[in-house]
């Protein structure tokens, strides 16, 4: 089937899913979760084939080790994927919510109401669990979606989507073609030109992918190109909390776009050596003089430096960061600590500003 027909089918599906009930959407999501659990061994088998093919690409230097790690599905990721779908089913329906009511004049009232976007084009690299996440969110928000995954995970992607659509086929009155998938670079080129049918493009991947998408389409793009994330350990921080926060932010999923890449430590923090030693025990490679402070490692590698005060930390983050996710570890038990926290929260130029305190 050519891409234009896929896009037309998606547009038709978007109009139909916008008209179904919350109960039907939630029933579909629960069915998807059940089917993924039922067929998880087949999904693992498909993923094993992708991993074998990807290993040869790693050996040849065509993909990185971090890309390989994102590709891998295991029992933990499978469990999280299934639970994530069930959690989305439990969420309040985001559609048809009154967001604003304003009386403009006598007998004239303005209502701002949430509604579906329409057709989403999702382009992603390596991570096959993205299919389940995006499909579930699309269903809950009453949108149709066209997925294009990386070639490294093609077998896993096909299997997961096959399971999802098999589950949807069992739900009476659920519209067809809500979740579709394409596979080639030609399909991507067609997707980027298809502003007649596609309402929003969401790229999920590295810097090169996101920039390419933004530069080659007239369709609105929702994407973030870099994940240069920081943690600032203030002078008052609790050492145990600092160790836990930094270790988890680097090791839980090193290739995630919100994994920490740079650690900033107040020069008056009394246990700098203890913190760095604990990180090394967690097999984190520390770099104190990197070639670039704007490098996304995607691995268990962490650049670090000491700073004189919270203002120097903020200046560093705003200069070298990507505005994604940044965190301060401090206390909230004294006036100075609270001033540092509030200043960090106000002045850091980040979409997500995390505050980790002991009260």
Label the predicted regions:
Residues 118, 199, 261, 326, ...:
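Conserved acidic residues
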Residues 254, 264-359:
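NAD(P)-dependent aldehyde/semialdehyde dehydrogenase
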Residues 9, 125-144, 170, 209-301, ...:
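ALDH superfamily catalytic-core signature
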Residues 90, 98-240:
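Rossmann-like NAD(P) dinucleotide-binding subdomain of oxidoreductase/dehydrogenase enzymes
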Residues 3, 22, 128, 239, ...:
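Residues at or immediately preceding the N-termini of alpha-helices
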Residues 1-110:
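N-terminal Rossmann-like NAD(P)+-binding subdomain of aldehyde/semialdehyde dehydrogenases
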């Amino acid at each position: 089937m050519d891409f234009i027909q896929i896009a037309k089918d998606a547009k038709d599906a978007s109009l139909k899913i916008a008209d179904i009930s919350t109960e039907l959407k939630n029933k579909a999501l629960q069915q998807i979760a059940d089917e993924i659990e039922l067929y998880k061994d087949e999904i693992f088998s498909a993923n094993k084939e992708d991993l074998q093919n990807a290993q040869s690409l790693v050996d040849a230097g065509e993909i990185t080790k971090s890309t390989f790690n994102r590709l891998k599905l295991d029992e933990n990721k499978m469990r999280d994927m299934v639970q994530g779908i069930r959690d989305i089913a439990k969420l309040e329906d985001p559609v048809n919510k009154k967001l604003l009511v304003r009386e403009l004049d006598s007998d004239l009232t303005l209502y701002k109401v949430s509604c579906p976007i329409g057709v989403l084009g999702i382009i992603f690299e390596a991570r096959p669990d993205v299919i389940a996440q995006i499909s579930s969110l699309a269903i809950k928000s009453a949108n149709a979606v066209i997925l294009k995954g990386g070639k490294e995970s093609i077998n896993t992607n096909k299997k997961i989507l096959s399971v999802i659509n098999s589950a949807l086929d069992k739900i009476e009155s659920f519209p067809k073609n809500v979740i579709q998938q394409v596979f080639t670079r030609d399909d991507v080129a067609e997707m980027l030109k298809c502003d007649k049918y596609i309402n929003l493009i969401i790229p999920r991947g590295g810097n090169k992918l996101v920039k390419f998408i933004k530069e080659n389409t007239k369709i609105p793009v929702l994407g973030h190109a870099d994940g240069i994330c920081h943690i600032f350990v203030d002078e008052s921080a609790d050492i145990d909390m600092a160790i836990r926060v930094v270790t988890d932010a680097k090791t839980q999923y090193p290739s995630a776009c919100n994994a920490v890449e740079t650690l900033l430590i107040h020069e008056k923090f009394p246990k700098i050596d203890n913190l760095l030693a604990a990180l090394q025990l967690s097999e984190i490679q520390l770099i104190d003089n990197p070639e670039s402070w704007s490098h996304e490692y995607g691995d268990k590698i962490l650049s670090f430096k000491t700073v004189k005060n919270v203002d120097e930390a903020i200046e560093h983050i705003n200069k070298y960061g990507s505005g994604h996710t940044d965190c301060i570890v401090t206390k909230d038990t004294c006036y100075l600590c609270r001033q540092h926290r509030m200043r960090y929260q106000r002045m850091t130029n980040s979409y997500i500003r995390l505050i980790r305190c002991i009260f």
